[in-house]
From Swiss-Prot:
Cellular compartments per GO CC: plasma membrane
Organism: Paraburkholderia phymatum (strain DSM 17167 / CIP 108236 / LMG 21445 / STM815)
Family: Belongs to the complex I subunit 2 family.
Keyword Transit peptide: no
Transmembrane segments: 5-25, 37-57, 72-92, 104-124, 129-149, 164-184, 205-225, 239-259, 276-295, 302-322, 337-357, 380-400, 414-434, 466-486
Matching Pfam families: Proton_antipo_M
Protein name: NADH-quinone oxidoreductase subunit N
Length: 492
């Protein structure tokens, strides 16, 4: 459909309008606008997220194209946009007290976060290599600035510089790859590139080099090995509120962005990029799970956890095509989509507890800070235990089903050795997740002060934990949504 009704873009426009309104209020009202800016960001993203969710659940919705087919609204985009929008809303609720204690409760944080969210929306709905790239840069530039908000804090500025320099390098790779694909196919639109590549009348060498550079760019944004160097330093160096913004929605958007690039644009070259993803996935699983064992800083440990989890997402991406056939593609890509959503939900809960333990002039970042948490707050200790079980893949947490679905897709693709590697490395990873559980329940607390968070945050954290358990017991509805979105969107 070429001339789709513009009403399909209203939730995206709502986020843009909220940015403009919040920016004007923050500029002309000043410090007194902090509370207003927070509520504008929260309300707009919750409404947009619910709107996206309603669109995603509307039966019979097909792709709708806008702006000369550069932007697409389809079931896949609606689901992922709902996830990142609601994920951002939860992030700022968890971050509020943390920001107030550190003098960061200001419009800049919320504005940069919303600009990052807008970039994620563009990444998810991009139907053109240029649109996908612009969405990526809008997201990335906002995150660089957000990480460096504490200019007087050396670790924060160092983390921002590392992220910026390596991000610029990855953007260069990506642009070079896109330019080679454009030179070979004569188009930047995903559908046209797909047709041109499928025709087989294009220089294979140019295509292969283009794919290599694009895969490198995708791997960097997902934090996959060997393009992971920025992840541990950024997670540890940035204030925890910024770490959650970086490690939450952008990971989901990066997966959606990679799916658009590789599947919607370069599916005929699946044999080529699959081989590269196999290497990236294997390295990510090994490095993420084994290196995480020796970490004493919880944020750095969760960074290596993110790397290993992106390895699982890559498993789902590479398992979609078997011997050039796409019969099992919907199941594989649906499992990867399900995994990325589950990872976001679990990450929100994990960092929510980390920020809950932090207080003015104190960061709860070491393993010792979790000792005896059950004695200080049984509810929050239970929530953290559920999150660790999910990350480790222990039932009944939803992480178990997510890992099982990806492993099944990998086995069906004939990559048994890779599935076995994933299981073995996950056993290593389970050690550092269960170590936190042991510290919370079997060690004496260093600080016996009871933990009391605000009512909103307590309620949201409890719901976060319940969601992980309920989805683990009844994963079918969410998996069905993912499979439906994939089957009605991708060229399978």
């Amino acid at each position: 459909m070429q001339n789709a009704p513009m009403t399909a873009l209203l939730p995206d426009a709502l986020v843009m309008a909220a940015i403009v309104v919040a920016w004007l209020i923050d500029t002309f009202v000043g410090p007194n606008s902090r509370r207003t800016t927070y509520f504008i960001a929260l309300l707009s993203t919750v409404v947009a997220g619910i709107w996206f969710a309603i669109d995603a659940l509307t039966p019979g919705a097909g792709p709708q194209y806008f702006f000369s087919r550069m932007y697409v609204v389809d079931p896949f985009a609606s689901v992922m946009k709902a996830v990142v929008s609601l994920g951002y809303a939860v992030s700022i609720v968890y971050s509020r007290k943390y920001l107030e204690d550190r003098g960061l409760y200001e419009g800049n944080f919320f504005l940069l976060g919303m600009f990052s969210l807008l970039g994620q929306l563009v990444m998810i709905s991009g139907n053109n290599f240029l649109t996908l790239y612009l969405g990526l840069e809008l997201m990335s530039l906002s995150l660089y600035a957000a990480i460096a908000l504490r200019r007087e804090n050396a670790p924060s500025t160092e983390a921002a510089m590392k992220y910026y320099v390596l991000g610029a390098l990855a953007s260069g790779f990506l642009l070079y790859g896109i330019s080679m694909l454009y030179g070979a196919t004569g188009s930047l639109e995903l559908n046209e590139v797909l047709k041109a590549v499928a025709s087989g009348r294009i220089n294979d060498v140019v295509l292969l080099f283009g794919v290599i550079f694009i895969v490198a760019g995708v791997a960097f944004k997902m934090g996959a090995v060997p393009f992971h160097m920025w992840v541990p330093d950024v997670y540890q160096g940035a204030p925890t509120a910024m770490t959650l913004i970086v490690g939450g929605g952008p990971k989901v958007a990066a997966f959606a962005w990679g799916l658009r690039f590789l599947v919607m644009g370069l599916l005929p070259l699946a044999v080529d990029w699959q081989e590269m993803l196999v290497i990236l996935a294997a390295l990510s699983l090994i490095v993420g799970n084994i290196t995480g064992i020796v970490q004493r800083n919880v944020k750095r440990m969760l960074a290596y956890s993110a790397i290993s989890n992106m390895g699982f997402v890559l498993l789902g991406l590479l398992a979609g095509v078997v011997d050039g056939k796409t019969g099992a593609a919907a199941s594989a890509y649906g499992s990867a989509m399900f995994y990325s959503i589950v990872y976001l939900i679990t990450t929100l809960g994990s960092f929510g507890v980390v920020m809950l333990l932090a207080r003015r002039e104190f960061e709860a970042e070491t393993l010792d800070d979790f000792k005896g948490l059950n004695q200080r707050s049984p509810v929050f200790a239970f929530v953290m235990m559920v999150m660790m079980f999910s990350l480790a893949g222990i039932p009944p947490a939803v992480g178990f089903y997510a890992k099982l679905a990806v492993l099944e897709a990998t086995m069906n693709a004939g990559l048994t050795w890779l599935a076995v590697l994933a299981v073995i490395t996950s056993l290593f990873g389970a050690f550092y997740y269960l170590r936190i559980v042991k510290l919370m329940y079997f060690d004496d607390p260093v600080d016996t002060t009871p933990i009391v968070g605000d009512a909103c945050k307590r309620t949201l954290l409890a719901l976060n934990g319940v969601a992980v358990l309920v989805l683990g017991i009844v994963p079918g509805p969410l998996m069905s949504i993912c499979l439906n979105a994939i089957s009605h969107t991708l060229p399978l």
